[in-house]
Amino acid sequence: MSGLQQRTLALAASVRKGEISARDLTVKTLADIEARDKDYNCVTRLLMHRALEAAERVDRLVLQGQDPGPLAGVPFGIKDLFDVRGEITTAGSKVLANDPPATQDATLVAHMIAAGAIPIALTNMDEFAYGFATINAHYGNTRNPHAPERLAGGSSGGSAAGVAARMFSISLGSDTNGSIRVPASLCGIWGLRATQGRLSVEGSYPFVPSLDTVGPFADSAGGLKACFEALCARSLADVDVGSLRIARLGGWFGENMSAPMQTAIDTLSMALGATDVVELPEVARARAAAFVISASEGAGQHLKRLRTQAADYDPAVRDRLLAGALLPSTLIFQAHRLRHWFRDRMHEAFAKTDILLAPALVGEAPRFDQPEIEIGGKMVSARANLGLYTQPLTLAGFPVLTVPMKVPGLPLGAQLIARPGREDQLFALAEKLETDGLAEARLI
């Protein structure tokens, strides 16, 4: 079996004990990615110099008897919209290919390195994070490690697929409308969209400032928690899982699931005792508002470059950005009003519950040659509707953890949603699900 053989926490423990050299592990990981990534296209650039530099620092601290950090020696991937010192941040586009290299690391990258993690590679993404599929006209498409003829999801697809393929144990992504949750579900790994504003976006290329959020992917619930603690530079308090009140989202989130997804969500709900059903109002309008805000703010980020470099954009992304620039201000204003209204309704939904459960997607990963899927008895765009269940929740800015449910066949993910700032509750439940055998990352 190729790739990393230990999961995040075990790997870090082995490095801290001196059982494994961080440098040797890094050299092997770099060689493994170079040999195997042709099958999946997760990585756009290897960070050989930075990786070896970080690994040698970790080994030096271990030899000196000092603590190298909770993620000592653990390789991590970085979505190519985070600044890495000495590298050009492309955000998945040729448009930025001639920009000057970053002079310092993004805040989250710096936090990861400070925790002992090894920056191993920049990962593929949809151009400027505008998509759910990691279909990229410039750097190629990322393929799902579980079925290379299928989508890995996006826009953080390279970060998710790289974890699933054991190329790195953890990775950084961003999530505006589902860009962590969708690929985590399709690739069968753990992912977290943090509470909006909780993790720094400094040094990351923006897409939709009103909605942009960042977060980690990992090969285990414990690894995801350790990564999050490193990113926010603080330890989370323990939570009594038995005291958590869990309910299931119904209505919009209870419709249109494939039979395997329906069965998986029903099974998980039963195991959690989530008998209460909560229905959010105006979910379809919330999703529409997310589309409007994304299109308008995304366009605003690119108008200047579109005037001079329009031909360098992926035509599909360029068309969406140009359409967003033409949206009337009254529509944008209404979308933001609905955003605030929907956030209030989300807060009300937690009056009698601590965690809400919902499917992450309608079903399994679509094939590349499958432009449409059936939803509600109609054939609709497969790629645009990957965010059917993730996009409405975007408006509220609440934390959402994606759970890789233990199911036969291709991976399926569930969303666990908590109040803002209560990632501790999400991690407590995630670790219990993993311990109880109800959830597990699917690595190849």
Enumerate the language-model features and the residues they cover.
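An N-terminal boundary/leader segment
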Residues: 1-52, 270, 442-444
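Glycine-rich, small-residue loops and helix-cap segments
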Residues: 18, 29, 73, 114, ...
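Gly/Ser-rich, acidic/histidine-flanked active-site/gating loops
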Residues: 73, 213, 230-292, 314-317, ...
